[in-house]
């Protein structure tokens, strides 16, 4: 398989009452992340049925771009801002892109 985009889904469950603070910190992080050269897409999703659950969909040009993201000041600020809001450790699953072709992004 040729090199492909790295797609990461980060699943988060926040403590009751932490929804708005998590949303605000995550929106700021997502906006800054979208300006990184190795980021193709960076989405924040809220569960329709459970206001305490969120998913971050992060799409990077490479694993190196994902690693570089974790070295940015905005990621560090987000990580620190949301640490006490987490009801449980966040979980991430990594995928490779199959379709559409990477050039279609």
Spell out what each predicted region is.
Residues 1, 13, 20, 51, ...:
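Residues at secondary-structure transition points
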Residues 1-6, 44-52, 80-105:
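Glycine-rich beta-strand-turn "strand-cap" elements at beta-sheet edges
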Residues 6-36, 40-44:
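N-terminal first-folded block
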Residues 6-13, 43-70:
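Short, well-ordered beta-strand segments in beta-rich or mixed alpha/beta enzyme
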Residues 14-16, 62, 96-98:
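Non-catalytic surface loops within mature trypsin-like serine protease
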Residues 28-40, 59-93:
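An amphipathic, aromatic/His-enriched active-site/gating alpha helix that lines ligand/cofactor pockets
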